[in-house]
Design a protein with these regions (language model features):
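FNR-like FAD-binding dehydrogenase module
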Residues: 1-611
Length: 611
């Protein structure tokens, strides 16, 4: 049973200035970190005043750092979408059960000054887009890569990287981190692990092997003797429905929200969570398990001359081939392993050549521009049904930024903003698995969903803080939720939205809602950039520069800034625009501007939900 309790706060013993400082320092922290601070503060108070009943309380300061570090396994994760965090949490739980003293931290919360005393360290980290670290891990990665990193001759470490092999810089962050730690004198106690999009099997096997080595190194005792240096996480009820057990959500509404003249299809979709037990907050994502378009499954069977009713056994399950292609395997994404298998079957020299190490750019371009159906038609091959299922990547869920606040629409429904992927290329119709599935979902459909928390993309706890939101295209989704939340909670801070798309008359998503929000005071500023309405294209980053003086003033006064949308181009262009704003209107040097933005990221005042 989930019961929302309003905390009863004691009369503050701090002055206004110290109270404000405390609010700034704790803003954006995860529940586990707040619990730790609470225990730490209580322990300090006990030691200072010797309050009766506070005997035997363990605090981090009660033993020398090297001694504590030698007795524990530190697990640090850097996660953008939650996968690395999930793997790290599972590893921490297994290590705890095995009798190890464990410290689990997100990379952004890791105390870098303690790295020199660390003895046993595991890092689980993902690589984003063009080999970039997750936002919350930038400081951690840059410190280890930089000149201030200490020599680490006493450290034993292991690194697991999560990535997507369709990108040229697959697992680049973990590879660089692994090499750098070794260069600093540290010793691997497990080889570098690399897990593709279907990461579960690799991550599980790597974790088991790494944990066994760690147990031997730390001489793990029985679980009953475990003593943690710091709490792993707050105790919370496990939801009935999760990634592995999604809830079949009924469709309440599925509405096209671009004009009939638009060459794009964007949907506003409302789903019912009634009876699911799922709870979310503004800023979270909804995981959707998609189904491939039936027409595409038929095209595959036709191109391969295979029978959809033929049963195939894989992963302990025996299913018809059509079911494997429809629900269990990725058939809209061309991957390097599938391309390699197909090239071997066809014996085609051109396909084999693009897989050579010096052809990384050509391979990346091919994987980006083609879908598997193009390959099957252009380079026919005699695929066996069993080998085909084995070669295809397992289906993975897609994450959509939630476009509603439960405080306004209620806890029993959730809204999405979905850009439908469907276009012609190479003589075929290219589909997006999840977006096509959602676009076709009618009143009788059940959409398998789960909640993916995004703790680093939260509104400020202090409702008087100003908020700046940058969300072109479907990146507008979480900011619809943010404005709803601010409206429902009566937040007094100002809200400034930057939105961009192609055409004002065709693609102004939620136009009526934003106009009403402006009139009603829920939105204080709205700056728009429509790229195709004039000869010279206008984008949101230009609006940032044009409003740079006021934008910088808001940030200097404590505003929180959020970015959502395309990671490949938009997010990087926006970041560059923010650097320009800091240099132009703050008088900062290039290095100081970078340091300023890095500090905002570290403080949680600059947050990105990019994909």
């Amino acid at each position: 049973v989930n019961v929302a309790l309003k905390p009863v706060l004691p009369t503050p013993a701090l002055g206004a200035e110290r109270l404000a400082l405390l609010a700034r320092l704790t803003e954006g922290l995860a529940p586990a970190e707040l619990y730790w601070i609470s225990a730490y503060s209580a322990a300090l108070a006990s030691l200072a005043t010797r309050i009766p009943g506070h005997s035997g309380l363990a605090v981090v300061a009660d033993t020398p750092a090297p001694e504590r570090a030698a007795e524990r396994l530190s697990i640090v994760y850097g996660s953008q979408t939650g996968n690395s965090k999930r793997v790290a949490e599972q590893l921490a739980k297994k290590a705890e059960d095995a009798g190890l003293s464990v410290r689990l931290l997100r990379a952004g919360a890791y105390p870098l000054r303690e790295l020199a005393q660390e003895r046993h360290l595991v890092v689980v980290i993902s690589s984003q887009g063009d080999g970039d670290p997750p936002d919350d891990a930038i400081g951690f990665v840059e410190f280890i890569a930089g000149k201030r990193a200490p020599k680490l001759p006493q450290l034993k470490f292991a690194v697991l990287g999560l990535g997507d092999s369709s990108y040229p810089k697959y697992c680049a962050v973990s590879r660089d981190l692994d090499a750098r730690l070794a260069a600093l004198g540290a010793t691997r106690f497990a080889p570098l692990g690399e897990a593709d999009v279907d990461f579960e099997t690799v991550a599980t096997e790597w974790s088991q092997a790494a944990l066994e080595t760690a147990r031997q190194a730390l001489n793990a005792t029985a679980p009953a003797n475990v003593r943690h240096a710091s709490p792993l996480h707050a105790v919370s009820a496990t939801p009935q429905h999760s990634r592995d057990n999604p809830y079949p959500a009924a469709v309440l509404e599925n509405q096209r929200i671009v004009s009939r003249d638009s060459d794009r299809d964007v949907r506003h979709i409302e789903l019912s969570l009634e009876g699911s037990g799922l709870r979310y907050e503004a800023g979270d994502a909804l995981g959707v398990w998609p189904q491939n378009p039936p027409v595409l499954v038929d095209q595959w069977l036709s191109a391969l001359k295979l029978d959809g009713a033929q049963e195939v056994e894989r992963d302990g399950r025996r299913l018809p081939l059509a079911r494997w292609l429809g629900r269990e395997r990725e058939i809209t994404r061309l991957t390097r392993p599938l391309l390699a298998a197909h090239a071997e079957l066809t014996g085609n020299r051109d396909l084999q050549r693009v897989l050579e190490p010096e052809q990384k750019a050509a391979l990346a371009a091919l994987l980006e521009s083609h879908q598997p159906i193009d390959l099957l038609r252009e380079f026919p091959a005699a695929w066996d049904a069993d080998k085909l299922v084995a070669a295809l990547r397992p289906m993975t869920p897609r994450l959509y930024s939630i476009a509603s606040s439960p405080k306004l629409v209620g806890e029993d429904e959730v809204h999405l903003t979905v850009g439908v992927v469907e276009y012609q290329a190479h003589g075929s119709t290219h589909y997006g698995a999840a977006s096509s599935f959602l676009a076709a979902a009618g009143d009788d459909a059940a959409v398998p969903v789960f909640i993916e928390q995004n703790e680093r993309f939260r509104l400020p706890a202090d409702g008087s803080r100003d908020v700046i939101m940058i969300g072109p295209g479907t990146g507008i989704a979480p900011f619809r939720a943010f404005v709803q939340e601010r409206q429902a909670t009566g937040a007094s801070g100002r809200n400034w939205l930057f939105f961009g798309n192609r055409h004002f008359s065709q693609d102004f998503l939620y136009q009526v809602e934003w106009q009403e929000a402006l009139r009603g005071g829920a939105l204080h500023r709205l700056d728009l950039a429509f790229s195709r309405d004039q000869a010279q294209k206008h984008y949101v980053q230009q609006r940032l520069r044009e409003n740079g003086r006021e934008l910088y003033a808001w940030l200097r006064e404590g505003a929180h800034l959020y970015v959502c949308g395309d990671a490949t181009h938009m997010a990087k262009d926006v970041h560059e625009a923010l650097l320009d704003v800091a240099a132009t209107h703050g008088g900062l040097s290039a290095d100081d501007a970078k340091a300023w933005l890095a500090e905002l990221l570290q403080q949680g005042r600059y947050a990105r939900d990019v994909y």
